[in-house]
Amino acid sequence: MKVTLVHLLFMMLLLLLGLGVGLGLGLHMAAAILENQPLDEFWPSDSQDTAEATEEGQGTRTTEALVLDNKEMAVPVWSEDTVLSEDEVGGSRMLRAKTLLQSKQGYLKFDLNIRDCNVMMAHKIKEHNQSCINDYTFIHEDPSTVGAVCNSPLVDCDLKGGKCHKSPRPFDLTLCKLAKPGQVTPNCHYLTYITEKVIIITCNNTKQLEIK
C-alpha cells in the first residue's frame, strides 16, 4: 500500500514537471514567433495603404512645382519679399518662388507635420468655389541647386519641346495629390507622399517638370 502511494506521488510530480516544461517551451516559441513577425502587421491599415500608394506614385508625370529650402521649411503664408509667378503648362499651372522668405520668422524647422500637403497647399487657396489643384510637387532644395540643373547637358524628354535637363541626383520632394476628384476650395484635401526622385525640367520661358 505504501509503495503504491509513493509511486502515485512520484507520477504526479513527474506530471507537474512535464506540464511546467511544456508551458515554458510554449511561451518561448510564442515569443520567437512574435519576434520574427513583420512590424507592418501591427500598423493600421491606412498606413499600409499610404505606403502602397507611395510605391504606385512612382510613375512619370507632368505636374506643378514650388522650390523650397531643404533644411528649413517656408511658411505657406508668403511675405512681401517673395515674388511668385505662374506659368500655364498644358492647362495647369506651375508656381515658382523667385525669392524665398528672408526673415527668420518666415521659416520653420523641418518637421514631418509641416510637410503635410494640406498645410503647404493652404496658401494656394485664394478664392472659394474654385476647382482644387489635382497634383502639386514641392521641391525642397536650394533654388540655386534647382537652377543649376539648367546648366546640365540636354536630354530627350516627353515634355513640350522635347529638350530637357536632368538633375544629377534625386531631389527631396513632397508630392501632393487630391484625395478625391471634384473637390472645390476651400475644402481641398490632399494625400502626402514624401520621396526623393530625379527631376527633368525644361528651361525655357515656360518651365515644365517631369519626375522620374
UniProtKB/Swiss-Prot annotation:
PANTHER family: INACTIVE RIBONUCLEASE-LIKE PROTEIN 10, RIBONUCLEASE
Family in the record: Belongs to the pancreatic ribonuclease family.
Post-translational changes noted in the entry: The N-terminus is blocked. Glycosylated.
Tissue distribution: Male-specific expression in proximal caput of the epididymis.
Entry's Gene Ontology BP terms: defense response to Gram-positive bacterium; epithelial cell morphogenesis; heterotypic cell-cell adhesion; male gonad development; positive regulation of cell-cell adhesion; positive regulation of flagellated sperm motility; regulation of fertilization; seminiferous tubule development
Chief location: secreted
Glycosylation site positions: N129, N204
Protein's recorded name: Inactive ribonuclease-like protein 10
Phylogenetic classification of the source organism: Eukaryota, Metazoa, Chordata, Craniata, Vertebrata
Signal peptide: 1-24
A Pfam family per the record: RnaseA
Alphabetical UniProt keywords: Cell adhesion, Fertilization, Glycoprotein, Secreted, Signal
General function of this protein: Secreted proximal epididymal protein required for post-testicular sperm maturation and male fertility. May be involved in sperm adhesion to the egg zona pellucida. Does not have ribonuclease activity.
CC per GO annotation: extracellular region
Localization (cell): Secreted
GO molecular function, one term: nucleic acid binding
Highest taxon of the lineage: Eukaryota
Organism encoding this protein: Rattus norvegicus (Rat)
Classification via CDD domains: RNase_A
